[in-house]
Amino acid sequence: MNIYIKTMREDDDKEVVAQACTSLADIVRDCGFAIIEPYITRLADATLILLRQESCCQQVESDGEDDGDIDHDEVLMDAVSDLLPAFAKVMGSYFDPIFTKLFDSLMKFAKSPHPPQDKTMVVATLAEVAQGMGAPISAYVDKIMPLVLKELASSEATNRRNAAFCVGEMCKNGGAAALKYYGDILHGLHRLFADSEPDDAVRDNAAGAIARMIMVQPQSIPLNQVLPVFIKALPLKEDHEESMVVYSCVCNLLLSSHPQILPLVPDVINAFAQVVVSPNESDEVKTVVAKAVSHLISVYGQQMQPILSALPPAHANALASFANRR
């Protein structure tokens, strides 16, 4: 660990420092907080120096930045920013005092003249820190949300995708601090469900954001307007890391017989049938979906038969097979 810290601070090769940061993030995720606890203050200081662009590798003089220098900077800062979510994942809420020290230096990368890829690096980092740190992110919501809302309308698909993921995590973990932004968030996300959105992963992450919002603040969502758009976006096409949260949200609404979801049951069943035949979805996700279908059959009986009969035979058989495992 001492060698990693020394490399971060003193090595003059950006590629070497980037690799040290990447390796360190992997070690933290794999081994947990215990292994870094004795070093956490020094690790945080080394990370801060890199975010401030004051380490040895960032001070090397050159005759001007060429494309290679810019590429090296991007690789380096991606690796540095990846340390923050790694720390947050293993430290949880205890990461907050360290994040406070790093926050302003991280946010500078989202300001001009930094390029779009720096902005989305910041947004992705914030999303994963919120995911790992939990409730303490609420103290940062007012500083983060203006950036993320703007990024929802970025011309870059990666930026829109990360922004959608970030607003979902901010709403999930930001508590009351995030509530006042719900209207603006829903407006920004709505564009990502439109036919004009060309990127499936963006739409999948928008669905993930809506799911998180519904699960934490259902009373703050106009479900009669949101659910038809949300359900129409299913099944997820590309980012299956969002599958569990999205389908769990839908299933919770079904299991509670929420009045706004019931008219959409035919569309939900059609999406669920595609989920259970998809090679890209886990058995865990398929089991969650099947449980909800079994519930609907047990509660609504004959009313479900026309819906199930309208499915392609292969889909209907797969859905029945999973439902019967329960």
Question: What is each residue range found by the language model?
Answer:
Residues 1-326:
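Karyopherin-beta/Importin-beta family HEAT-repeat alpha-solenoid scaffold
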